[in-house]
Amino acid sequence: MARVRYGARSLDELRNREVEATKVDTWATTLVATYETDPEAIKAVLPPPLSAPAEPLVRVTVATVDVGRGYPIFGAGTFAVHARHEDVDGDYALVMPMTTEQAVVGGRETFGEPKKLAEIALVRDGDAVRGHFARMSTTFLEITGTVTGEMEPTPDRTRTSFYLKFLPSPTGKGFD
């Protein structure tokens, strides 16, 4: 029988994660684009129990991540739509391309993140920026932009991401 489970964390657990995250030499260069789309398109891709939010937004993130400690830089991305569960707004990722298996396995197997191996490029040439995702030689996302100035830092906030994790039943009928 399917059931909804939450990975909600206490404020102490959230603070501990913030402390742990600042102890490593991780650095990411990120291009983020948010745009409005057709509300019907969002409704079509959201699984129950999620519903369409008031604003039909898509968030695309293209990044290169340097975790330090001698590991190679890898590419990471997200293509997500805004969603709602009961009274909580958040994002529902449709795909999270990654360039290494190490980046894929932990999030996919542990949290149900929709991670897939893919090629990711993020390039800045002067003020021009561009990023893309490609899988099996097919580019499925391209984003371009122009840097026009410095932005103020985003205020501290909580961001919610919804992931659905399920496994097919060994019997071949339904899910475990």
Over which residues does each language-model region extend?
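Acidic-enriched, low-complexity/disordered segments with a strong bias for Aspartate over Glutamate
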Residues: 12, 25, 38, 66, ...
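Internal, well-folded beta-alpha domain core
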Residues: 91-176
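Hydrophobic/aromatic-rich structural module bridging two neighboring secondary-structure elements via a short loop
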Residues: 65-111
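N-terminal domain-onset segments
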Residues: 1-74
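A contiguous strand-loop segment
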Residues: 3, 84-89, 119-122
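Hydrophobic residues positioned within well-ordered beta-strands of beta-sheet architectures
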Residues: 31-33, 79, 131
